[in-house]
Amino acid sequence: THETALKNFSVRHNQEFADAEAKLTWYNRRLYLKTNDGGKIDCNAVVDDLIEGIRMGLIERKRNVPHLKTFATAGEGDYSKASLIGVDYDIEYAQQLAEPHENLRMIINARAVCEARPLARLMDDALDEVCEKYDLDCQVFFTECAPICFRMMMGISRLQALSQQAL
């Protein structure tokens, strides 16, 4: 059954999983958004529109994203964690921001079935559209967009990459 298959599935020492993952592009970005007028806005709408912009960019290019996560913080302890596990799925929220804010710190992490350059462009386009719609200033602190196989060749394992991301 499906449940039995899930219980027996492991990504460790699973060559089929490793081969599939090696074809994906890894994307990471850290950024800061703030309103240009200093007013507070619905930051959940900003996150939603950003993810929808990414989804539409992938659909236009006939690509997909098995893993897209955003983590956004604003104010004291207020945060949002959203996930998209494919362009045909709804956005899932582990947490949404409780109130409007004037600024937002965000991490975008994705593994996508898309070549690196088109993925980077569509991410930039989605962010530009959100900034224009909500009149936001954006400061990007870090962007990484590369095929996972390239990361492996460079000696960066997924665990190393995740630990670097946490720093």
Please name every model-derived segment.
Residues 1:
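Internal gly/pro-rich beta-alpha loop/helix module
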